[in-house]
Amino acid sequence: MMSIRRICGWIGIMLVVFGFSGFAKAQTAVEYPIAKVHNDLCDKASLQRGAMLYMNYCAGCHSLQYVRYDGMAKDIGIVDKNGHVLEKMVDENLNFISDKVTDPIKVALPKQEAESWFGVAPPDLSLITRSRGKDWLYTYLISFYADSSRPWGVNNAIFPDVGMPHMLQTLQGLQRATYKTITVTDENGKPFQKQIIDKLELESNGAMNTEQFNKAMTDLVNFLDYVGEPHKLERKRLGVWVILFLI
């Protein structure tokens, strides 16, 4: 029987082959509004929930090569009263790939094999919030909708013709898009009508309601915001102490 780790590795490659690497290629002319995410890097419970979501839904596909399990665990508060990393908890809940908590967060399938078999390897997401912005990422995560014309049966409101399945559909459910017609002008100034997405509405339920799912995606973005710049967390902590000292 194929192991869970191997299955995760295959899923990761499938996502990249069918276009998830489009994070680097996504269209820049976005007409759907970008939502504002209100994450808090000082909220360790949120960071821990986000880490759990990432490891269960994303880590089989995308590495976080600049972060080590033990360093991450210490930063987000998975430690005992003496500040020592709870390695057993990390191994049971977050580390499904490596044998050591001191290892960086990598995918199950080696990059060389992915490149040899498919010509491309899954993109690392360590810096996704810095390159795309956390608001863009949050909006992307909550904006999948049903589209029978697409290979995976879904599309994305801010990433038209997305090539990956909706990996979080079991949590969110499936949305449908309603459209509106607007008048725009072409490069010659000639007006024409164009259909764009007006809003997304939940068509079938998932394990979470909309409020719960949006909160979960805030946690996931919060975790990736931390990953993109781990020292930001320490600067925020120091900033609080400096302010208290000056008062």
Describe the function of each predicted region.
Residues Y54, Y140-D147, F223-V227:
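Bilobed periplasmic-binding protein/Venus flytrap-like ligand-binding cleft at the lobe interface
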Residues Y54-Q65, L220:
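The canonical Cys-X-X-Cys-His
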Residues T28-M52, S63-K74, G228-K236:
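Electrostatic cytochrome c docking/interface patches
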